[in-house]
Amino acid sequence: MNEEEINKQLYLLQRYQEQAEQIYGEAEIIERIISEYERAIETLQEMDTTSEKDVLMPVGGNVFAYASLKDTGKVIVNVGSGVFIEKPINAAIDILNRKIDDLRKSQERLIKTAEEIKARMEEIGRKISEGDVQVSEKKD
């Protein structure tokens, strides 16, 4: 392997590294969304088992307001494409669980892709190492 080929392989290695980092970043974002959905499920389960109607409502910027719920048996759920529908709590929990399942599948696909990229990176690293030996042997 000559110096130009090694440089090409190094460039490829760098591009793969960037791709892997981007993929792992996307997987991390998905994990945060899953955590948010799981917290929502916990809150819905709590609402379903309590008759207490006083809550702290987030208004943004880590600021909360005291509020009272009129109906703890139903919630408004985003079912996709900006469409919101009133659903009983159990149905809302089912929707969130399906979304979590879909997100986990996406996350698994991303991680599999990242592992494939990592394997390619290891192969390139091996080729470069072998190439470096050949180049350094020629210099001696």
What are the residue ranges of the model-derived segments?
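Intrinsically disordered, low-complexity regulatory regions in eukaryotic proteins
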Residues: 1-79, 83-140
